[in-house]
Amino acid sequence: MDLYFSYISSYSQKVLLGLYEKNVAFTPHLVDLTSQEERARFREFYPFGKVPLLVRDDGRMIPESSIILEYLDQTFPQSPRLIPADQEDARQVRLLDRMCDLYLNDPVVSMILESWKPEPQQDSEVMDKAAERVGLMYRFLGDHLSGRDFLAGNQFTMADCAAIPPLYFAKTFADFSSVGQLQDYWDRVSQRPAVIRMWREAEPYVRALMGE
């Protein structure tokens, strides 16, 4: 099983968290998204050119982070289960996963891309709108986490895989230390071995991306 990914891709980080949590072996293929030549080569292999991309041993391609995690959870049912067996609990996990992708990750990516532009070219409306959406998710997550260790309850799930990468980038632009439940959650998940491993591997690439 092969994974094509980039450490600077939050959706790749999301899948890596799932793989590391479940301790699933895979062959890594790092795609340099900063290289036009490498992106072009990857598009020859996968025309949509998006990472992460999981390729099974039989050659079948499985794209899109949430679909990859669903496949992993069904194929490797060992603990932790990223999607609960109970249908209602599973719907809740999928909803939270989707919300984190749309209302946290996407606006954070918009903020990052806008911040790379020379200051006179930055669109303040784009930044303000993205910051508003991120703030809304901060408040939602802070309230939602009350009485919960993780987003979907007391078990780590796909929803947490979706939340952790964009939260890392988001705090660069909008501090959430005053959102009590959210900060407590961040402190808690940051101690998980899978999270520590993923950030240890990704940090040099992320720092270079952010110009640190």
Write out the residue ranges for each language-model feature.
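Terminal-tail/helix-coil boundary detector
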Residues: 200-212
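GST-like domain detector, emphasizing the conserved glutathione-binding G-site
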Residues: 1-128, 142
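GST-like fold's C-terminal all-alpha helical module
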Residues: 100-193
